[in-house]
Amino acid sequence: MCIRDSKWGFNYSITGYFAKKVVYYQNAITQSSQVVYEYPFPIIRLGDLYLMYAESLNEATEGDNNVPEEVYTYLRKVRERSGLKKGVLGETEDIGDVRVAWEKYSNDPTKPKTKDGMRSIIKQERKIELALEGHQYNDLRRWKDASKELSKSIKGWNVQGEIEEDFYKVTTLFVPRAFTTKDLSLIHISEPTRRS
């Protein structure tokens, strides 16, 4: 199932998962050759800016039940760009609107109406939209969730499996390391000294 041959060495994924998102569409690897094209990958994307703006608006607003309409607007832009819009799955509701999606398809339909709920939703949207783009580590540190999230076991498929049934068994690959909040806290920036 995984690509492990003498020519390319260990050219395989330890988890069994392969990322297609950041791979140029003309790249190809076969048993006998490898074609790799370099391309300019965007460092900052518009979706990232929209999500940062929505998060900032949510955090800057006073009160817990006072989520600004603009937060929903910018989340909608990100969701619609990725294909979540009215009619895409045959539904009549606009699932690009996070309020509609959570009301219809979740166990907590009131979650988007509170500041804490929107914080959680924005975190989830960032994980989905910006997956494999190098944002998650610093997001986890900024949210102070790193010690909880990075201390979990890493799981994947059994890449040693020779048949499908063995390959697709979820396996614990790494036992979690113990991270502390101190290890993962942001670097302190002191106040600049004033010149008299």
What are the residue ranges of the model-derived segments?
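Acidic/polar-rich alpha-helix caps and helix-coil junctions
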Residues: R4-L186, S190, R194
